[in-house]
């Protein structure tokens, strides 16, 4: 049976993650309150931010920025966008 969670991002019961994506309390919070769909959507957005803003994951400030944006993304606050990005036509 599939595990479901009340998704913090989409405000509905959705399929949950199979395991916490991070170690510790932060990972457990995401596991318990973020759906697999919201996590996949965040990973796509995170990739856009890393590429378009040229973030370096070896840089502590860039990692801190991305962590803050993830918190905003899941809590429904306004979060950073990749300026000038135009999604490909389907």
UniProtKB/Swiss-Prot annotation:
UniProt superkingdom: Bacteria
GO cellular component, one term: cytosol
NCBIfam families: PRK05408.1
Listed Pfam families: Iron_traffic
Keyword list, A-Z: Iron
GO biological process: cellular response to oxidative stress
Name of the protein: Probable Fe(2+)-trafficking protein
Family label: Belongs to the Fe(2+)-trafficking protein family.
Function: Could be a mediator in iron transactions between iron acquisition and iron-requiring processes, such as synthesis and/or repair of Fe-S clusters in biosynthetic enzymes.
InterPro entries the UniProt entry points to: Fe_traffick_prot_YggX, Fe_traffick_prot_YggX_sf
GO molecular function: iron ion binding
């Amino acid at each position: 049976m599939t595990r479901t969670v009340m998704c913090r991002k989409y405000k509905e019961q959705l399929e949950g993650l199979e395991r916490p994506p991070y170690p510790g309390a932060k990972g457990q919070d995401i596991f318990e309150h973020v759906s697999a769909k919201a996590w996949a959507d965040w990973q796509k957005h995170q990739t856009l931010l890393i590429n378009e803003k040229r973030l370096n994951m070896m840089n502590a400030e860039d990692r801190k920025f991305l962590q803050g944006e993830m918190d905003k993304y899941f809590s429904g606050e306004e979060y950073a966008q990749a300026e000038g990005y135009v999604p490909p036509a389907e």
